[in-house]
């Protein structure tokens, strides 16, 4: 009895072994990409991007609070998760917008996806620039300006 690979001959077995080796290497690469260390790096990169967008948004929509204050509110509201869904599914995204608030005429980003992180950051800067800080309970429980 030759075994299942015996029917391929030496050349076929060699190609099969090479294919398996490539698959195993690729699986290892994907496993490395999904490792906790890489997940932490990508989270850190994402949070750094959010802070950079906050700088841009504040330049476009000046408000009196610091960028650190906006960052703290975001972390309080969603822990930096753009796909966060609050209790009972009423509040969504980085800054936990209610769909009714998000769709308000004040919001130039209202036609964008409510889960879009950049849109939420810019909408929040716009909201703060027109005095809507009271819409976030985390605004009052995070320290500093």
Show the residue positions of the predicted features.
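Export/targeting segments at the very N-terminus of extracytoplasmic proteins
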Residues: 28, 35-80
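Catalytic cores of secreted/periplasmic lytic hydrolases that degrade extracellular macromolecules
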Residues: 140-145
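Extracytoplasmic/secreted proteins, especially bacterial periplasmic and envelope-associated proteins
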Residues: 49-52, 65-72, 92-97, 119-127
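Substrate-binding/active-site groove segments that recognize
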Residues: 89-107
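Secretory-pathway/luminal and periplasmic proteins that interact with or process carbohydrate-rich
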Residues: 78-85, 131-136
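N-terminal prepro-regions of secreted/extracellular proteins
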Residues: 1-47
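A short, structured beta-strand-centered segment in the mid-to-C-terminal lobe
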Residues: 110-119
């Amino acid at each position: 009895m030759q075994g299942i690979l015996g029917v391929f001959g030496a050349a076929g077995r060699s190609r099969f072994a090479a294919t398996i080796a490539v698959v195993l290497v690729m699986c290892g690469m994907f496993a490395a990409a999904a490792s906790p260390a890489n997940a932490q790096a990508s989270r850190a990169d994402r949070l750094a991007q959010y802070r950079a967008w906050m700088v841009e948004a504040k330049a476009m929509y000046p408000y009196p609070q610091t960028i650190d204050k906006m960052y703290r509110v975001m972390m309080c509201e969603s822990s930096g998760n753009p796909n966060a869904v609050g209790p009972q599914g009423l509040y969504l995204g980085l800054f936990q917008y209610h769909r009714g608030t998000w769709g308000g005429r004040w919001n130039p980003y209202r036609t964008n996806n409510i889960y879009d992180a950049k849109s939420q950051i810019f909408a929040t800067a716009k909201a703060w620039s027109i005095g809507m800080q009271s819409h976030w309970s985390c605004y009052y429980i995070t320290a500093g300006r």
